[in-house]
From Swiss-Prot:
It is found in: Cell inner membrane. InterPro entries: EF-4 (IPR006297), EFG_III/V (IPR035647), EFG_V-like (IPR000640), EFTu-like_2 (IPR004161), G_TR_CS (IPR031157), LepA_C_sf (IPR038363), LepA_CTD (IPR013842), LepA_IV (IPR035654). Coiled coil: none annotated. Required for accurate and efficient protein synthesis under certain stress conditions. May act as a fidelity factor of the translation reaction, by catalyzing a one-codon backward translocation of tRNAs on improperly translocated ribosomes. Back-translocation proceeds from a post-translocation (POST) complex to a pre-translocation (PRE) complex, thus giving elongation factor G a second chance to translocate the tRNAs correctly. Binds to ribosomes in a GTP-dependent manner. The lineage of its organism: Bacteria, Pseudomonadati, Campylobacterota, Epsilonproteobacteria, Campylobacterales. GO terms for molecular function: GTP binding; GTPase activity; ribosome binding; translation elongation factor activity. Its EC number is 3.6.5.n1. Keywords: Cell inner membrane, Cell membrane, GTP-binding, Hydrolase, Membrane, Nucleotide-binding, Protein biosynthesis. Residues 2-183 form the tr-type G domain. This is Elongation factor 4. Belongs to the TRAFAC class translation factor GTPase superfamily. Classic translation factor GTPase family. LepA subfamily.
Length: 596
């Protein structure tokens, strides 16, 4: 066991983490060059296309060093903020981590968040400066940044190019010499941490585990500690990118895949502990929490008869991703659909894209919202995720909304614009730190509701794509909030309701109705688009009616005849206006996202 090294790679998106993982795999000879597809560790198509790692993957590698055989377990972590819980579980399974920073870009916001998780788990951190082959690489500047922001000594940082293979051998040898072997105790009660789980069509739900203490073997009876359910181990594998390698047992310190013949991933949740029935642990490994949804949106099939197909698709995705929550809801405007909870905005985009791509569904998504805590006058606390569920104003004592701590690293030339944006988003400055004269680190407390709409896009366009951004939830705070309703032709469109700060309600209402005016198709009658708070109309626009020339067939002749026809048309339009229905296009529901 002293020759096992468990390590993971921490990096910001696009800093070359998956490429570096591929280089380490091929250097250890686990895959021949012919079999090497770029990004072996990323298995979902959507991961390769977006260049992001969503699920934590693992691979067991063998390497000979100083005439000794070593086992290297590379545990890949997702780099994106939405998946930080998966990151924390992956890092809890390791003794060390490679901190990969792009030599041309420097330290980014997400890197910092993940490094702090690694430091909390007391991991040995090896700084790795990647992409040194780039013409604009500045190794010394990046070393200074790592020391200044993260406080890790960089005099022994390893410089590599994952693309050309420079420095990879030295990196692997540093992993062996610097990262400690796992502390093991084969006789202690069995404890195995699940740090990833996924669904296989033939084997059912699979759990990727790191054995902390004790050991498990095929045909053992084990217990999943949070559910208290017993299962028999049907098979054990060592993870490998091409085909897993069967094994009869896993000892403490090792990493492997456990097959329990389960139907859903919900039975083996990330962060849970597996223990043996005959050698049972008294308590689980700390830190387990069910993944909590932060951002909610309504998903509706464009063809209403596809509702059951959407339910089946969500059920299947849930097998693989236990963090999604969903429940059926109906909307007067959109029919039947689901209110779906996601870990964050990227997670929402990925899930929507997977539903459309893997299950051939056409979906309308409503504006994303967050959870609000409504304290009622009768003392009751109600939590809502859908603005249309907000109780009447006279029943509300106060409303609390979730806040997040936003960390932003930006070139200093964009600082003024960014501070203006953050102030407009009701942000409160906590910290401002010049890393170098050219780069600034900002910390702000911002309401999550202001971030879920379009904050990320605005941040990127204001800073020409150079700023990086990361956030973590902190607490609920009292806010002066109201519900803004949109009426089209006198009818409330529930899917367009949003909760906004009182001082912004007037301007948001005006922007929304003028955006809607451009989108709502013209009818044969006038259509009023109104924004209201409670019963009070605060903004209005009118979509003019299409004219039909009813007097065209009167040649010359009596003016009263023409007047009679025009009067008749006016009557008809009045009737139509009273009962007319307006079909709203998909863009109308997206217009909510576009307003600032």
């Amino acid at each position: 066991m002293k020759n096992i090294r468990n390590f993971s790679i921490i990096a910001h998106i696009d800093h070359g983490k998956s490429t570096l993982a591929d280089r380490i795999i091929s250097e250890c000879g686990a895959i021949s060059d012919r079999q090497m597809s770029s990004q072996v560790m990323d298995t979902m198509d959507i991961e390769k296309e977006r260049g992001i790692t969503i699920k934590a993957q693992s691979v067991r590698l063998n390497y000979k060093f100083n005439n000794e055989n070593f086992v290297l377990n590379l545990i890949d972590t997702p780099g994106h903020v939405d998946f930080s819980y998966e990151v924390s579980r992956s890092l809890a399974s390791c003794e060390g981590a490679l901190l990969v920073v792009d030599a041309s870009q420097g330290v980014e916001a997400q890197t910092i968040a993940n490094v702090y998780i690694a430091l909390e788990n007391n991991l040995e951190i090896i700084p790795v400066i990647n992409k040194i082959d780039l013409p604009n690489a500045d190794v010394e500047k990046v070393k200074h940044e790592i020391e200044h922001i993260i406080g890790i000594d960089c005099k022994d940082a390893i410089c590599v190019s994952a693309k050309t293979g420079v420095g990879i051998k030295e990196l692997i040898e540093t992993i062996i010499t610097k990262i400690p072997a796992p502390k093991t105790d084969d006789e202690a009660p069995t404890k195995a941490l699940i740090y990833d789980s996924w669904f296989d069509n033939y084997l059912g739900a699979l759990a990727l585990v790191r054995i902390y203490e004790g050991s498990i073997a095929k045909n053992d009876e084990v217990l999943v500690m949070s559910t208290d359910k017993k299962h028999i181990i049907q098979d054990l594998f060592y993870p490998h990118p091409l085909s897993p390698i069967k094994t009869q047992s896993l000892q403490s310190g090792e990493v492997g895949v456990v097959v329990l013949g389960l139907k859903t991933v919900g039975d083996v949740q990330v962060g849970d502990t597996i223990t043996s029935v005959k050698n049972k642990a008294k308590e689980a490994i700390g830190g387990f929490e069910k993944a909590k949804a932060f951002v909610f949106a309504g998903l509706y099939p464009i063809e209403t008869d596809k509702f059951e197909d959407l339910r089946d698709a969500l059920d299947k995705l849930k097998l693989n991703d236990s963090s999604i929550t969903y429940e059926p809801e109906t909307s007067l405007a959109l029919g039947f659909g689901f209110r779906v909870g996601f870990l964050g905005l990227l997670h929402m985009e990925v899930i929507k894209e997977r539903l459309e791509r893997e299950f051939n569904l056409d979906l309308i998504a409503t504006a994303p919202t967050v959870t609000y805590e409504i304290y009622q006058t009768d003392g009751e606390l109600v939590k809502i995720q859908n603005p249309s569920e907000l109780p009447p104003v006279n029943k509300i004592d106060h409303i609390k909304e979730p806040y997040v701590k936003a960390t932003i690293i930006t070139p200093s030339e964009f600082l003024g614009n960014l501070i203006t944006l953050l102030n407009r988003k009701r942000g409160v400055q906590v910290k401002m730190d010049y890393i170098t004269p050219e780069r600034v680190l900002l910390e702000y407390d911002v309401p999550l509701n202001e971030i879920v709409m379009d904050f990320y896009d605005k941040l990127k366009s204001l800073t020409k794509g150079y700023a990086s951004f990361d956030y973590e939830p902190i607490e609920f705070r009292v806010g002066d909030l109201v519900k803004l309703d949109i009426k089209v032709a006198g009818e409330n469109v529930d899917a367009l309701s949003i909760i906004v700060p009182n001082e912004k309600a007037q301007s948001k209402g005006r922007e929304l109705v003028s955006a809607m005016k451009e989108i709502v198709p013209r009818q044969l009658f006038e259509v009023a688009i109104q924004a209201s708070i409670g019963n009070k109309i605060i903004a209005r626009e009118t979509v003019k009616s299409m004219g039909k020339n009813v007097t065209a067939k009167c040649y010359g002749g009596d003016i009263t005849r023409k007047r009679k026809l025009l009067e008749k048309q006016k009557e008809g339009k009045k009737r139509m206006k009273a009962i007319g229905k307006v079909n709203l296009p998909q863009e109308a529901f997206l217009s909510v996202l576009k307003i600032d």
